[in-house]
Amino acid sequence: MEYTVNSFSEHHAKLNTQINAGDAPDVFWVNPEYMRDFVDRDQLMDLTDLMDKKGVDVSDYLPSSLEKMQYVGEDGDTHIYGVDCCIVGPVIFYNKDLFDEAGVEYIPTKKEDQWTWDEFVENMKKLTKVEDGKTVQYGTSNFEEKFSLYTTLELLGSNGAKWFNGDYTQAVGIDSEATRDTLTKIKELRTVYGVAPNPTAVGVDTSHSPTQMFMTGQVASIFVGSYALQELSQSGINLGAGLPPKMAEGTKPIGSANLDCIWKDTKHPEEAFELVQYLTSVDVCSDVYKTGLWMPNRVSLYKEENQDKWYNPEVYPQGWLDMTWLWTEASLRPFDHLRNTDEIYDTCTVYMEDYFYNDGNLDSILPEWQEEVNALLEE
């Protein structure tokens, strides 16, 4: 078996080129936001019959994982074109020592104790330190995250902003009051309350990236995908983890992760599917789950009697098991069933940065933003 590695920035374009040239690998991973384009181009093998033939219990996949794997064809039937191995989604990691110094209670891990947005802001104020007119410690960071990741999208959904219709063919809620309210609150963390750093000031200095600022004590907490735990658990920080704050009725978590797919024209379909089964098996993935990089994507693994297959108390912060609903109840990340996703990402970045950093007006930005995304979805 030959194994090749691509950089993420060129991976999907290179795959498309290889497939068009008839020289693609038999098995490859695809980030879910690119799946619809590969499916629409008829480049992936339909795994539905093989899954059934091999007795794969698809009902054991978490709802968001199964939705990500399934596509409704022109025949109206559901088809599976890729298999995932995990789920990730955003949580708030924090430095317990900095919370103790400020006399701030730890961020709740139980749903019934979850902070409201206002409670979160007030506590982040207590964690922010200013010396001689300069902020030397911020309360939190990474809420202004790019749309290809998680935090901004989760807050939008939690505040009731439903950006797309049911089959992800039309943008319906970019220009909405929920979007206005969410983006305003995120920006105010930095511009009104001063509890978050300006990410545009980072430049190429990676020592001031959100993660590095957190690990060096310049920020007390960071809102980021759960995958960050693998790195943060090795940082030496007295690490805690808690629920994101509620914006409206409560958090509506999102989750995602890449899928393993098979080239439609592979000469070895049975062997390729056997490899996909191996790569996505619990036996293989459990070792990665225990590092904190991934969370399990199977319903059965969250049952108490199976938690020892993934839960590592030396890695996962106290209270983590209270938060597993963030993954078991997660919805699919809304960008994961779009077409022309790269172009949509670029458009979203332009409009979001115009508002966050150029004092753009949401009343004029959001209608244009929605119109441009719809034009891309119609291409």
Label the predicted regions.
Residues 1-64, 97, 101-103, 107, ...:
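Extracytoplasmic "Venus flytrap"/periplasmic binding protein-like
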Residues 75, 315-372, 377:
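C-terminal capping/gating helix-and-loop segments adjacent to ligand/active sites or protein-protein/ligand interfaces
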Residues 32-91, 118, 238-245, 308-314:
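Hinge/lid segment of periplasmic solute-binding proteins
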Residues 227-231, 258-342:
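Mature extracytoplasmic/periplasmic domains
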